[in-house]
Amino acid sequence: MVWTRFKSLANFLEKFQTMILTIVRKVLLPILPFFVGSNFALITYKGQLGQMQTFIWVVLLIVLCQFVWMFIMYVIASIYSRRNGWLVAKYYPKAYFTALGTMSSAATLPFALECIAESPIVKKDTADFALPLFSNLHLCGSVIAEMSLVSAVYYMMFGCLPNMYSMLLFAVLACVIAIGSPGVPGGLNMSCITILGSIILVDQAPEAMVEFFGIMTAIYTIQDGFGTACNVTTDGALALMTDKYLAKKNLA
């Protein structure tokens, strides 16, 4: 009886997930380019286009931070596993550029599995287990981009940075929300709208919140491919650490 109910619940959740992803792909994603374009049109109309040049440097800084983080992750993985992390990372350019183009961890997963299968130091069974798991749980590149853009947009609009307590609380909650955010373009940013309004913009007028969300979504969507690529590439480092851990526990 219990097993039958469990299977019924699992089937319901799978159908619900399929329904939500269908809505995202069929409704939200097609209108996203129009939303981004309308926000840039509004920025141009208000004469704020000159300020947008600042975000070019912000995006470049975000990409640099993501590459630094990828390097750190593979160094940590090499130290923990006592194997050369380069023997995983060097096979990942294909997955990186696929993620850069698709802006979707889910769409890039088959290519990531192909890439890590070429590595001689990660077992196939471990990779098949670890990569699908981490593609949903581990969104470090997206969180780096989200935190950086929140600070940059806030400074552009209000002339100061959010207080440290609010940013730390937002960072913790963003990491938690990242676990459940959909693996679609702009998924983390859209998932963080609620905590943006309740933590970072709690003292701002509703009109300012709407404008903030619009600018955030426009800029985030443009650079989202780099965050997704960072997510996918660092999953290889986590897979290497997972392989070592399972070997130590005699589980693989």
Predicted regions mapped to residue ranges:
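Transmembrane alpha-helical segments of multi-pass membrane transport proteins and ion-pumping complexes
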Residues: 30-34, 62, 66-75, 79, ...
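Transmembrane alpha-helical segments and their short flanking loops
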Residues: 148-252
